[in-house]
A protein has these predicted regions:
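Acidic, serine/threonine-rich low-complexity disordered tracts
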Residues: 29-135, 201-308
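Bacterial N-terminal signal peptides that target proteins for export
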Residues: 2-16
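Extracytoplasmic beta-rich ectodomain segments of secreted or membrane-anchored proteins
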Residues: 117, 165-220
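Hydrophobic alpha-helical segments and helix pairs
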Residues: 130-173
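Hydrophobic alpha-helical segments, especially N-terminal targeting/anchoring helices
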Residues: 149, 192, 266-267
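C-terminal motif of bacterial Sec signal peptides marking the signal peptidase cleavage site
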Residues: 24-27
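Residue-level signal for well-ordered, solvent-exposed loop/turn and beta-edge residues enriched
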Residues: 154, 197, 270-272
């Protein structure tokens, strides 16, 4: 006879990787993935990823002089986006498992920004700390992506169209990196602001669990359209339950912390940050419905922008 506790342990052992992926929207391919299947070419097909709407609230307009910030984009822009994530988890007192993903560097060129709300992106030669992923990324050079943006800089949609020879692992890595960057971006208030202005950007992040994300932005400095903005991010789960994909069941969320900070240098005339880094991390604890087995996670992810 198998006890309820033994059944729970077996169930959680099988769901551990699923939970890691479900709760971390930045996951790409884990270090233990079978690259023989993950790197097979797949037919080109574009994917459009809707982005949850933002609510921006001005808390302090800052010092005079003040003026509005409007994202009126023109010309081309070339930047590098780097992302990385660290994920470890432990079931009860078993050995700690590592589901971290290697750092990915993605050169991006924004072009054809004549439309008021559309930004076209071209992917350059992407690289990874994992040589296997770097090899898989090589055929993805020239892939297309795009952003739909408001005049206050809020991103409302992300679309990705990989090149013909893009492999599955490369497609997933690019998609996750861009998605991660979208939810670490910042939009501007409608009202006039000056140095010292503080505003919040509220948005839901949909992964395995719906998270309410509040980004508090502080305008550290401003020189015309160039702004340096400090960010403080906090995520809280909307539910007390983590629903696992593919009807794999659910886990109770016993505790959940996810916070972060960073600084972005932006130009209102360009769609992507010029430079900066944002890191968000925290600890979570889940348990099976019987409460006899506990899954603990430690997660951290970083987005970094540089201009070559």
């Amino acid at each position: 006879v198998i006890s309820t506790s033994e059944t729970s342990v077996r169930r959680l052992r099988g769901l551990a990787a699923v939970a890691a992926i479900a709760t971390l929207m930045t996951a790409c391919t884990s270090s233990g993935e079978d690259m023989s299947s993950a790197t097979s070419p797949s037919p080109t097909s574009g994917v459009s990823l809707p982005v949850t709407p933002v609510t921006t609230t001005l808390l302090d307009p800052g010092a005079e002089p003040r003026s509005t910030v409007r994202s009126v984009r023109s010309g081309d822009q070339t930047v590098q986006l780097s992302t990385r994530s660290a994920v470890t988890q432990q079931i009860d007192d078993q050995a700690v498992q590592d589901f971290s993903t290697p750092e990915l560097t993605l050169p991006l060129t924004a072009t054809d920004m004549n439309s008021s709300d559309t930004v076209n992106l071209r992917v350059g030669t992407a690289t990874s700390a994992d040589q296997r992923l770097t090899d898989a990324l090589a055929p993805a050079e020239g892939s297309a992506a795009g952003l739909t943006m408001t005049d206050t800089g809020a991103i409302t949609a992300l679309r990705i169209t990989p090149s013909d020879e893009t492999q599955d692992s490369a497609r997933a890595a690019i998609e996750q990196a861009l998605n991660q960057a979208v939810y670490r971006s910042v939009s501007y208030p409608e009202a006039e602001i000056g140095v010292g202005a503080v505003w919040t950007v509220e948005q839901q992040v949909i992964s395995g669990v719906t998270l309410n994300q509040v980004t508090t932005a502080t305008l550290r400095s401003r020189d015309g359209d160039r702004l340096t903005i400090d960010l403080r991010i906090e995520q809280t789960p909307e539910s007390t339950t983590l629903e696992l994909p593919e009807d794999a069941g659910s886990l109770a969320i016993d505790s959940y912390t996810m916070t972060g900070t960073g600084t972005l240098e932006v130009d209102a005339g360009k769609p992507l940050p010029l430079s900066g880094e944002v890191t968000v991390g925290g600890k979570q604890q889940y348990s099976d419905p019987e409460g006899s087995t506990v899954l603990r996670q430690d997660i951290s992810d970083t987005v970094r922008w540089t201009t070559p």
